[in-house]
Amino acid sequence: MMYKKQNLPELTLRGLVLGSILTIIFTASNVYLGLKVGLTFSSSIPAVVISMAVLSLFKTSNILENNMVQTQASAAGTLSSVIFVIPGLFMCGYWSEFPLWQTFMICLCGGGLGVLFTIPLRRTMVVESKLAYPEGRAAAEILKVANKDQSSKKGKQGIKEIALGSFIAAIFSLLSNGFKLAASESNFAFIWNKMAFGFSMGYSLALLGAGYLVGLAGAIALFVGMFLAWGIFTPYLSNFEFDSAKNAVDLASSVWSSKVRLIGTGAIAIAALWTLIELLKPVIEGIKEIVKNVKITNQEKNERTNIDLSLKSIFILFVLMVVGLFITFYSFVEDANLSIYYQMLFSFVGTLVSVLIGFFVAAACGYMAGLVGSSSSPISGIGLIGVIISSIVFLVLGVELFQDPMLSKFAVALAIFTTSVILATAAISNDNLQDLKTGHLVGATPWKQQVALLVGCVFGTLAIVPVLNLLYQAYGFVGAMPREGMDASSALAAPQANLMSTIAQGIFHHNIEWGYMAFGVFVGILMIIIDKILRRTQKMSLPPLAVGIGIYLPPAVNIPLVIGGILKYIVMQHLTKKYAKNSHKEEKLASCEQRGTLFASGLIVGESIFGVIIAGITVFSVSMGGSENPLALNLANFHDSELFALIFFVGVVLYFIKRIVKKDA
């Protein structure tokens, strides 16, 4: 850790102000993109770059202050994930307008609990584990390089690698997401013997960089999951859904989204549960470590990098969050005009389910973020698990009560409402451990980072609520329009919320296809067994969570990750042979690996920053009554966007290899 023994200013007023502004901007952009296409981007890395640029204007700025800004701003990309659930309250027909303070409290209390739940996990998952945490490491590398002596050869070279990767990714992002000259993905499918085989190739350079940081084990597991989904499950199941009126792409996509994705959810659920079982002992040890640190803090004042928020502070904040949740649940339940007994019962159980599941999900999400990165961690899959558990709990409690159609609608809404709290907790946990990893690598003070995370939750929440309401009033959601006569074609899809609403309604109306979920659990158990065998006999691994993720995520997301992981393995194997007889072998390999890490980090930076810029331009254009694609060139004679994207992507891969292999270390 670079600055472990230095006491530099970390939580500063200017840093908090800058972090708050970035949080609001990134959150607004993420809410729009998430509702439109079901995706959000991590704001940590662009926050690092912007923070360095702004704070460099002050002579007294330092690496730890920059780290606090990105820690605070990271709440934007993750807390906005609640949009994967909340629109479901409109889609099931329960809400017709946003109760602003209820939505505010969901985000604030859920996000706050996510921060608190990661505290006992920090030492276990961040300090002592070997998890990759790709975005966390990337942010740390950027901070380190930017704070090195700029006159040194290595410092200048590091900045060059980041800048070059950023520039390339930014150009492609502009061509793809802005000008619409390059496709973001290509879809292929064919039908053989009434079975649909599908495949999609994504061209995201940020995911290519993230795959490089994830490495080979995660890449292979993702590929296995993807092969199971699109090489076996989808073709087999499509045989029973065959419709000659549908083309191959539509048939394969519909089968995957409606059935195979449920298999992935089942696999993720059992893999996450197994992860929790394996982590139970170290988590308990982590909690004991906090108690130990509280007792000896006065004896170890110099060990600031080991100090979390005090147990007293955690307890007070926890109680405040739980009380706030109970009041919010009571307000929600009160609208259903139930007896006081059921009002208190559902309020208490909703709060209890949110807190208990939230804690266990926090551990699982932290592990997933370390394994495949926050950008690829299937938060919506966690949401599906949450909505299923919540629905079953409430169904058991009010099985007779919910025979009434109106109360059945309330039950669906209550399950979705509870899931939104769980998802807010999970989303923050998913990214917070990335931030704490960054802090650990640069020597930040944990308790100060945890304060910055809580501040980020507050300002992220302040942005989410009004933006969410504004977009709903302007466009509506698919199947839930705020006014009659609106153009349904412009409605925001909110795909994850639609799926969760469907599942909740299916449970209460007894028409969900549980068989696919159960089969997914079987697949997950099989992967756990294979992983255990490989670890014991071959010194290899096949992370079962990553296999489930490979089934759940579309190939357009998986493929760049897989390519990045394989690319790193091939390059490092080549370099190991190249420097086998070199007396400075380890130094040479470390230098090459760092160069690759920095270039990969640059790819993530460039695409992330331009994602923010283009999202901001889009939101501004739409709010002014303009186009949803204000930068699109709309060239009538240009029909080769997919070929152009493929050539660009392959060119970047080849250039990536050249930067690492052929350049003198």
Regions found by a protein language model. Give the residues of each.
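Alpha-helical multipass membrane-protein architecture
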Residues: 1-665
